[in-house]
Amino acid sequence: MPLELPSLNASIVGNTVQNGAVEQFLNIRYADIPGKFEKPVLKNDWNGAEIDATKVGPVCPQPRTPFNFFSVPDDLWEKVNVDTYQDGLLCDNLIVTRPKGVSANARLPTVVWIHGGSNIEGSIYNLIYEPQFLVAESVRVGKPIVHVCIEYRLGLAGFLTKNGKGNWGTWDQYTGCQWVNRHIQDFGGDPLNVTLTGESAGSVAVHNMLIKDSMNGRKLFRNAVMMSGTLETITPQPPKWHARLEEKVAKVTGKEVADLASLSDKELLDAQIKLNVAVCMTCDDGDFFEPGWKQHLTPDWLDKLIISDCKDEGMLYFLPVNAQDDEELLAKVAKSPVGKEISELYGIKEGGDIKSACLDLKTDATFNYFNHLLFKKMEEARNNGSTSRVYRLAVDEPNPHNPDQRAHHAVDVLYMFNSTKFNEHGDKLSRLFQSHFLRLAYGLEPWDHRNFGVYRNGGYQQLPLSELNKVRPVERYEALSKMDFGQVGRLSNALSRL
C-alpha cells in the first residue's frame, strides 16, 4: 500500500527491512539540477505521481575507492562500493528510513546525515552509512527516529566555479535540509526537531549549514553533531583561487573557461583525476557564504552540539607519509618558516619516530585542533549568556575489524551505523555509542555536560572537562594557537604530498 505524501502531491512505495520493523524509501528526488554548475531547484510537487523508492538512485560521478579503508570483512567490501549508476544531473536524491507504520502526525525526532569524502567521493548508498540498523536500534530502546541521508554533487561537478560563483554541492546539501523542513512530516518526522549530523567533509558541511541557517533565521535545526571537521578543515577559498582551478581544468580538457559547463561527467572526472584534486574546496563567493558569515562561526543558538574526533585522525594520511624517506620529511620541516617550532613541539627529529610524529601533526592541523577551538568558543559563549550546550567526545577505541589501524579517521562512523558485522563486544560498544545520539535527538543530555565522553580500552567512560588533557594534547593545541597557523597548515599539507 503506497504511503500518501500530501505535501509533495505524491504517494510512495518503499522497502521493509529489519524483519519488518523498519521502512526505507530510496532515491527520493529532493531537487532538480537545471544544468552543470547551476543551483538546485527544490522539488515540492510530483503532480500526483507514485514514487518508486525501492531501488538505489544515482550518485555523483567519482573515483572508485581503491582499498578497504575500514577493513570491513571481505564479504561486505563489495557492498561498500555498491555499483550504483552515476549521473551528475540526477544525483540530488535522498533516503528516508523510519520505523514501520509511523503515522504522519507522529512527529518523531528527525536525524539528517551528510557523508564525508573530501567533497570528491562518498555516497548515501555506501554500506558504511546504512541507517536501517540505527533506526532499528532507536525502536528497540524506545527512542524511535526518522533518519534522512542526503546525496549531493561532488568533485569538480559540485565545486568548480562559474562566473565567480560555486558551492553547487553545498547548495545541494542545504536544499536537502530545506526539503526535510518542508516534507518530513509526511513520513512521521518532526520538522521542528531536526538533528543535523556529519563526519569529516560532512562535518564541515554541518558547520556550513549552521552558518547559513544562522544567517537565515535559525529555522532548520535544533541540534547538531560534528564528527571530525569544522569549517576550518575545508576553508572557503576566494574566487581568485577558484579561477585558477578553472584555468587548470580548461588547459587539461582543451576547452575555454567559458565552455567548461559543456564537459561531460566523464570529462570532468578525468580532469579531476589528472589534476590530482584530493579535496574540493568551497568558495567564498558572497552567495552561499553571504557577507558577514564569519560572524556566525560559533553556533551558540543551537540547543545542543556534540563535537567529536578520533585519536589517530592522521592515519588517513598514512600511505603518502609512509611512502617518503625520513630525510624527505625532515627536509620539508626544515624548509618551513615554522619548522623549528614544529620540530620541537612534535619531536620531528633525527633519531625519533619521524613518520608517527608527522601523522600526529596531521591529526592536529587537519582535524582535532580546530575541534578544540570550536569547543572553547562554544564554552565561552555559554559563559557569556548562550543557552546552548556543547559536548566533547573523544573516540580512542581502535577499528574493531583491524586494531592495527588504531582509532583512525572515520572509525566513529563504524560505531554510529553498526552496519559492518561487529563481534559481540563491538556490537555492544556501537549500541552504547548510538545511545548518545538518540538521547540528543530526544532533547536529553548525551552525557553530563560537565564531563567529556571517551571511548578507549574496550569501553566508555566520562571524565571531568578539566582532565581533557589526559586524552587530547591540550598543551600542544595552546602552543599551536601562538604560531602562524597558515604556515602550520602549509607544512602539514606538504608532509602528505608526494
Swiss-Prot record:
GO terms for biological process: lipid catabolic process. It is an enzyme of class 3 (hydrolase). The active site is at S200, H409. The keyword rRNA-binding does not apply. One of its GO terms (molecular function) is triacylglycerol lipase activity. This is Lipase 3. Disulfide bonds join C60-C91. Its EC number is 3.1.1.3. It comes from Yarrowia lipolytica (strain CLIB 122 / E 150) (Yeast). PROSITE patterns: CARBOXYLESTERASE_B_1. Glycans are attached at N193, N384, N418. Belongs to the type-B carboxylesterase/lipase family. It catalyses: a triacylglycerol + H2O = a diacylglycerol + a fatty acid + H(+). Keywords: Disulfide bond, Glycoprotein, Hydrolase, Lipid degradation, Lipid metabolism, Signal.
